[in-house]
Curated annotation (Swiss-Prot):
Biological source species: Barbarea verna (Land cress)
GO molecular function, one term: rRNA binding
Protein name: Large ribosomal subunit protein uL2cz/uL2cy
SUPFAM superfamilies: Nucleic acid-binding proteins, Translation proteins SH3-like domain
Database matches in PANTHER family: LARGE RIBOSOMAL SUBUNIT PROTEIN UL2M, RIBOSOMAL PROTEIN L2
Location, primary (coarse class): plastid
Organism lineage string: Eukaryota, Viridiplantae, Streptophyta, Embryophyta, Tracheophyta
InterPro entries in alphabetical order: NA-bd_OB-fold, Rib_uL2_dom2, Ribosomal_uL2, Ribosomal_uL2_bac/org-type, Ribosomal_uL2_C, Ribosomal_uL2_CS, Ribosomal_uL2_dom3, Ribosomal_uL2_RNA-bd_dom
Subunit details: Part of the 50S ribosomal subunit.
Protein's cellular compartments: Plastid, Chloroplast
Length: 274
């Protein structure tokens, strides 16, 4: 991804840094309208998730996370922008006439061929079970449950690494630094997700943030005591506590939120690094 800088004629162009324009011309049979789930509200209209609302209308692209078109070669026809994720997507034309979207692997270009199945070549964009991959392979779009489709390492620039295979399980190092076990029969896609420079983007102005459906974030220390535990005081005052808390008084910034008795606790060998 190439970062594009504008001529500094306004504050928004001076501070903004956007990626090169990748056009989107989705196929009608691979898109459908998506309800935005109340923009952070529940069925009664009460805010349950803050800082959400507004945003441009979107059409959801059906992404093939399962990669279950076995032993059928496909060709990359287009590389498109997807408003629902920070990674690009590819339109694949398969040999049997079917067309699907997949996540764009880093380095893939229009005209490349991909295939899914067992014992397929270890090539960027190919999908196969972990048991058929050599150790050290860089992978993304990893299944947790067999046949459910990829659920791990799907964001732009994400990549995991196969570090061991023993018995019925494979050991993976995830992008977060977590090391966990997954069934060797689960499939994954070879390579890294594209658009690796997405973290270099700068929106440059508040309006661009609103287009993404993200509302402004206000610090608790500038609120009144009735609105936040950090609020109040004369002038610029500290929070008045040993540790920061949420608007509802629960510990924030560092407290672990994962359930201790979750079913997958035994599959995690090393928790993610901070």
């Amino acid at each position: 991804m190439a970062i594009h800088l504008y001529k500094t004629s306004t504050p928004s162009t001076r501070n903004g840094a956007v990626d090169s324009q990748v056009k989107s011309n989705p196929r009608n049979n691979l898109i459908y309208g998506q309800h935005h789930c109340g923009k952070g509200r529940n069925a009664r209209g009460i805010i349950t998730v803050r800082h959400r609302g507004g945003g441009h209308k979107r059409l959801y692209r059906k992404i093939d996370f399962r990669r279950n078109a076995k032993d059928i070669y496909g060709r990359i026809v287009t590389i498109e922008y997807d408003p629902n994720r920070n990674a690009y997507i590819c339109l694949i034309h398969y040999g049997d006439g079917e067309k699907r979207y997949i996540l764009h692997p880093r380095g893939a270009i229009i005209g490349d061929t991909i295939v899914s199945g067992t014992e397929v070549p270890i090539k960027m964009g190919n999908a196969l079970p972990l048991t058929d991959m050599p150790l050290g392979t860089a992978i993304h779009n990893i299944e947790i449950t067999l046949g459910k489709g990829g659920q791990l390492a799907r964001a732009a620039g994400a990549v995991a690494k196969l570090i061991a295979k023993e018995g019925k399980s494979a050991t993976l190092k995830l992008p977060s630094g977590e090391v966990r076990l997954i069934s060797k029969n689960c499939s994954a896609t070879v390579g890294q997700v594209g658009n690796v420079g997405v973290n270099q983007k700068s929106l440059g102005r508040a309006g661009s943030k609103c287009w993404l459906g993200k509302r402004p974030v206000v610090r608790g220390v500038v609120m009144n005591p009735v609105d936040h535990p950090h609020g109040g005081g004369e002038g610029r005052a500290p929070i008045g506590r040993k540790k920061p808390v949420t608007p509802w008084g629960y510990p924030a910034l560092g407290r672990r939120t994962r359930k201790r008795k979750k079913y997958s606790e035994t599959m995690i060998l090393r928790r993610r690094s901070k």
